[in-house]
């Protein structure tokens, strides 16, 4: 059975595809999660995260932009942006402890993103939590 970390990783992949302009990905979310063996409770968890992030994307992106020290949303890599979007959705709309959400985002960024991403993601999420 898949873990929540694996479910989040799948959601990041879906958000990444969505960010690259594949709006049609929303039609295939169920099949993609099934292919990655994300099932039952974890599938419900992943669907909630993906759909919630997409539904609240404008508000999430506003949070990112307003907490950047410099640059714009388009300056952030797609993987890093996907990790941030998911984490910010969880911070704003889910009831998990903020420290767990931030730690999970940092760990996922170590595996999926560029070398400087964990520090950048940690700093930005920390600012958002403290705002």
UniProtKB/Swiss-Prot annotation:
UniProt cross-references to InterPro entries, sorted A to Z: NusB-like_sf, NusB_fam, NusB_RsmB_TIM44
Classification lineage: Bacteria, Pseudomonadati, Campylobacterota, Epsilonproteobacteria, Campylobacterales
GO annotation terms (biological process): DNA-templated transcription termination; transcription antitermination
Cystine residue pairs: none
Entry superkingdom: Bacteria
Gene Ontology cellular component list: cytosol
Gene name in the database record: nusB
Family annotation (PANTHER family): ANTITERMINATION NUSB DOMAIN-CONTAINING PROTEIN, N UTILIZATION SUBSTANCE PROTEIN B-RELATED
Family, per entry: Belongs to the NusB family.
Protein name: Transcription antitermination protein NusB
One GO molecular-function entry: RNA binding
Gene3D superfamilies for this protein: NusB-like
Role description: Involved in transcription antitermination. Required for transcription of ribosomal RNA (rRNA) genes. Binds specifically to the boxA antiterminator sequence of the ribosomal RNA (rrn) operons.
SUPFAM superfamilies listed in its UniProt record: NusB-like (SSF48013)
Entry keywords, A to Z: RNA-binding, Transcription, Transcription antitermination, Transcription regulation
Protein species of origin: Aliarcobacter butzleri (strain RM4018) (Arcobacter butzleri)
